[in-house]
């Protein structure tokens, strides 16, 4: 049997979930020789000390401990675990998951180079029922979880069915992840999974969901907090509101990156490759910066008459990190020191002076007056713009309502976006290995 590098990230208030996950690893893995990597991003419950006691059971347990006053965040720490993995095959498990019997044997049976293998989740009824998972309530408290009952349920419900949905837990060859640069640290609280899915598929990796490997998932423990579902918990509900704000900012960054929120259509053959067309916008008569922000995200470049808009937009981009920093308890001072660790939006790369616009060098140009454009065009037109361009066969000049656009070259540029680079971490800011 090949050895797997199981990668688990954890943070504050999760020790009981971690203990349960390790119980399931001990009970349900067929071998204890696999490498287990745990990234402790923050710790307020003695998780590090408890994990040290597990080295006798799991001789290849490797603990990565963040000692900074800020969290790396899961986009970054997943990348770091995969970088540190000793084996060709990596398998990511969230700390609030529980694995079925012979999980390692099953994923090894199905994974191969060029395959992104997703296990099937079993979740409590906190989210809508869906065809991509089992909904079954084994409880919300990890200290009261009946591992034997879950293991029996999983044995009874395993099947050889395969579908194509994408989510954690997942297993793949480490090289496939490294080849596209891993998670983009531009996304700090959500959307990082959708982004990496698009890039993996563009790099000819196929997503396969096996219904033979099952994992219970308490859901949203890391992103929203262990008590996010408790309507009577005021602190948890306040945190949930901040997470929702952070989600909105992440969606804006995703739209800037890919033109709209999308995954590529899921067909019987798997996810289709996404397409992306470079669209430059000449936005005239900008008086309302909030309105401008709601429109500018749909274009890869924006040209404006007033250069001051560039600085104003940079301030808006910088403000977007406030919600994530609040959730991660990162002060403004700490963010100034450590923000270099993450990809960030730079307004001057996207927003430029109208005097610099050479339309002959642009693939596609759209022109409109911001004051005369209604917000309804965002949902009726702009979120579909990439698809509209894709379905437009001829080049030339066209009009749609207040928009005038010219297609000089219809070239799919998605291939240039599949590989990303994240900033290097300074040596003095690296985690320690134990």
Predicted regions and their residues:
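Active-site donor/metal-binding and catalytic loop motifs
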Residues: 209-238
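A conserved acidic beta->alpha catalytic loop
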Residues: 39-49, 306-311
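Short beta-strand-to-loop acidic/aromatic patch adjacent to the donor-nucleotide binding site
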Residues: 87-100, 363-370
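A short, conserved alpha-helix in the catalytic core of glycosyltransferases
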Residues: 164-181, 187-214
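Glycine-rich, basic loop-to-helix element that forms the pyrophosphate-binding segment
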Residues: 67-85
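Conserved donor NDP-sugar-binding/catalytic core segment of glycosyltransferases
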Residues: 98, 102-140
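A recurrent flexible, glycine/aromatic-enriched loop bordering the glycosyltransferase active site
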Residues: 150-172
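Short, acidic, metal-binding catalytic loop of nucleotide-sugar glycosyltransferases
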Residues: 23-33, 294-300
């Amino acid at each position: 049997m090949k050895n797997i590098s199981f990668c688990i990230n954890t943070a504050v208030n999760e020790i009981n979930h971690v203990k349960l996950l390790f119980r399931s690893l001990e009970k349900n893995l067929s071998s204890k020789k696999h490498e287990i990597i745990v990234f402790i991003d923050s710790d307020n419950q003695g998780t590090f000390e408890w994990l040290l006691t597990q080295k006798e059971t799991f001789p290849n347990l490797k603990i990565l401990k963040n000692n900074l006053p800020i969290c790396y965040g899961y986009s970054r720490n997943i990348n770091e675990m995969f970088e540190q993995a000793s084996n060709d095959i990596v398998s990511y498990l969230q700390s609030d998951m529980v694995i079925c019997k012979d999980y390692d044997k099953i994923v090894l049976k199905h994974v191969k180079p060029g395959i992104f293998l997703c296990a099937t989740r079993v979740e409590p009824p906190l989210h809508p029922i869906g065809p991509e998972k089992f909904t079954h309530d084994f409880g919300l408290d990890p200290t009261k979880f009946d591992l034997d009952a879950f293991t029996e349920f999983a044995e009874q419900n395993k099947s050889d069915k395969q579908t194509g949905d994408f989510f954690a837990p997942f297993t793949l060859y480490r090289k496939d992840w490294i080849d596209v640069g891993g998670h983009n640290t531009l996304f700090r609280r959500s959307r990082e999974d959708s982004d990496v899915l698009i890039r993996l598929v563009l790099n000819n990796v196929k997503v396969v969901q096996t219904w033979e490997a099952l994992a219970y998932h308490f859901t949203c423990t890391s992103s929203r907090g262990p008590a996010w579902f408790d309507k009577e918990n005021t602190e948890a509900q306040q945190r949930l509101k901040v997470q929702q704000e952070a989600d909105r900012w992440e969606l804006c960054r995703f739209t800037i990156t890919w033109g709209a929120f999308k995954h590529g259509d899921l067909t019987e053959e798997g996810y289709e490759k996404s397409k992306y067309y470079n669209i430059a916008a000449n936005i005239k008569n900008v008086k309302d910066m909030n309105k401008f922000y709601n429109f500018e995200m749909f274009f890869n470049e924006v040209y404006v008459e007033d250069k001051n808009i560039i600085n104003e937009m940079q301030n808006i981009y910088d403000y977007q990190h406030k919600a994530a920093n609040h959730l991660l308890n990162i002060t403004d001072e700490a963010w100034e020191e450590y923000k270099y660790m993450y990809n960030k939006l730079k307004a001057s790369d996207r927003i430029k002076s109208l005097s610099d616009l050479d339309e002959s060098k642009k693939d596609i140009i759209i022109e409109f007056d911001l004051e005369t454009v209604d917000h309804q065009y965002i949902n009726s037109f702009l979120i579909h713009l990439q698809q509209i361009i894709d379905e437009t066969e001829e080049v030339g000049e066209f009009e749609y309502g207040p928009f005038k656009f010219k297609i000089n070259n219809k070239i799919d540029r998605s291939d240039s976006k599949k590989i990303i680079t994240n900033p290097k971490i300074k040596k003095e800011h690296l985690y320690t290995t134990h």
